[in-house]
C-alpha cells in the first residue's frame, strides 16, 4: 500500500508541476530579465514611420517631492486613415505627418536605433529607473524596439514628451 501511495503522490506531483512555468514568476529584487535580440539591426534605413508607441518615466520637475510621471503614447492611423495620437489616459487627438517627422528626428538625434533589440530590465530598482520602451514600425517593414530601465540623464524622453504635449496643446 505504501508503494501505491508513493506512486500516486509522484504522479500527482508531476501533473501539478507540469503546468508550472518558472519563467512566468516575477523576478526577485535585483533580478534581471533579459530577452535581448542580439541580431536586431542597429541601423534603421527608413524614415517613414507608420506606427509608434512609447512609455517612459520622468521626474516631475514641478513637484517638491520628486514625484514620478509615467508617460505613455501611441501613434497610428485611425479607422478613417488619419494619424491619431492616444495618450495613456485614453485621450486622442488627430495629428499629421509633421508629428511623425519630429519623432523620427528625436530617434535620429539620440541614436535610438542603436538600442534596437534591447529588452533587458532589472527588477526592484527605484521608480525613477523603472522600465521604458519604444516600438516603431516603418513603411519599409523595418521595426525599432527596445525596453530597458529608465536613465534619468537621457534627453530623449523629455524630447518625446514635449512633442506630444505640443501636439495635444495645438488640438485643444
Locations of regions flagged by a protein language model:
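Short, well-ordered, aromatic-rich surface patches in folded extracellular/luminal domains
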Residues: 22-65, 91, 99, 106, ...
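Acidic/histidine-rich, surface-exposed loop or edge segments in extracytoplasmic proteins
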Residues: 78-91
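N-terminal intrinsically disordered, low-complexity segments enriched in P/E/S/T
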Residues: 65-67, 71
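Short, solvent-exposed coil/turn segments at beta-strand boundaries
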Residues: 73-81, 140
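Positively charged n-region of N-terminal signal peptides that target proteins for export
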Residues: 1-4
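Bacterial N-terminal signal peptides
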Residues: 8-16
Amino acid at each position: 500500500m505504501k508503494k501505491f501511495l508513493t506512486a500516486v503522490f509522484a504522479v500527482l506531483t508531476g501533473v501539478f508541476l507540469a503546468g508550472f512555468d518558472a519563467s512566468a514568476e516575477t523576478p526577485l529584487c535585483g533580478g534581471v530579465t533579459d530577452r535581448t535580440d542580439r541580431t536586431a539591426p542597429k541601423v534603421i534605413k527608413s524614415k517613414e514611420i507608420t506606427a509608434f508607441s512609447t512609455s517612459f518615466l520622468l521626474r516631475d520637475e514641478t513637484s517638491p517631492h520628486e514625484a514620478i510621471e509615467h508617460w505613455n503614447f501611441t501613434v497610428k492611423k485611425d479607422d478613417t486613415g488619419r494619424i491619431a495620437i492616444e495618450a495613456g489616459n485614453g485621450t486622442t487627438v488627430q495629428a499629421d505627418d509633421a508629428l511623425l517627422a519630429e519623432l523620427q528626428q528625436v530617434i535620429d538625434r539620440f541614436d535610438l536605433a542603436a538600442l534596437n533589440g534591447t529588452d533587458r530590465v532589472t527588477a526592484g530598482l527605484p521608480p525613477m529607473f523603472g522600465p521604458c520602451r519604444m516600438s516603431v514600425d516603418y513603411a519599409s517593414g523595418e521595426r525599432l524596439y527596445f525596453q530597458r530601465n529608465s536613465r534619468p540623464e537621457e534627453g530623449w524622453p523629455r524630447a518625446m514628451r514635449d512633442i506630444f504635449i505640443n501636439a495635444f496643446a495645438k488640438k485643444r
